[in-house]
Amino acid sequence: MAIYLVGDIQGCFNELSSLLLQVNFDRNNDVLYLAGDLVARGPNSLETLRFVKSLGESAKVVLGNHDLHLLSVHAGIKKAKKSDNLSALLAAPDVNELMDWLAAQPLLQEIPNTCSNSNAINQANNNSAYMSHAGISPQWQLSVALEQAKFIQTKLASSDRNTWLALMYGEKPNDWHQAITEIERFRYSINAFTRMRFCFTDGTLEFEQKDSPENITLTNIVPWYELSQTINNTSWVFGHWASLMGKSSHPNIYPLDTGCVWGNQLTMLRWHDKKYFIQSSELSD
């Protein structure tokens, strides 16, 4: 019985399958945590969604920005780009069922230390870590992140899903203290959970830079995890930031996006012993 955590798949289903074979994943006993961006750009988004959904309680998903974009495209709010590579998924006979399932997934998951049974997964554990697609806002305490994740999940699972999806676009407010209305809190929280990489030194969100920190010459921005107080007391697992290539200067941080869809590799982490498993991308030159 083990907990495995995997980075951004983005439709790279063959690489995911190879990793699961590497670790002898047992869906009846093991649990797979997925750091978001299950879909887009890669060749097999439909197969990825169908498989993860089929795992039932053995899969714990957090939504990423590409997953949310897919929901918006399906709802007619946004148009798919050719590079999104979503045509087969959107034309699938079970697309509505898949979208309902996807929309019901959270933006934040707790990762327990043990995996003895399904109940243990749902029990609060003071020593456990957390996973979200991009991280946790340095302007939040953990209690606020949990509250906002529940708030968003409720909205996206409601009959007003499409209304809320349309409201999530935009980069303002990028300061939690200026997020006064319900809509502003929704948009800020979506951005913090799924788009954040760097923050300005006052903790506000910065959206332009995607490079690794060592390549950034700007002095007024830092990685979100260098400002967060939450991660001094708990570990955080996230994806989204491919240029980190799984590396971080902070001991409680576990970046798992290693750019499989860009031809690099898909990374999986076995939680109890922190052992990494790597599968090279089939999209490499």
From Swiss-Prot:
Any one GO molecular function term: bis(5'-nucleosyl)-tetraphosphatase (symmetrical) activity
One Pfam family, short name: Metallophos
Catalytic activity line of the entry: P(1),P(4)-bis(5'-adenosyl) tetraphosphate + H2O = 2 ADP + 2 H(+)
EC number(s) stated in the UniProt entry for this protein: 3.6.1.41
UniProt KW keywords: Hydrolase
EC class (word): hydrolase
UniProt entry tagged with the keyword Hydrolase: yes
Superkingdom of this protein's organism: Bacteria
UniProt record similarity statement: Belongs to the Ap4A hydrolase family.
Task of the protein: Hydrolyzes diadenosine 5',5'''-P1,P4-tetraphosphate to yield ADP.
UniProt-listed NCBIfam families: apaH, PRK00166.1
Protein name: Bis(5'-nucleosyl)-tetraphosphatase, symmetrical
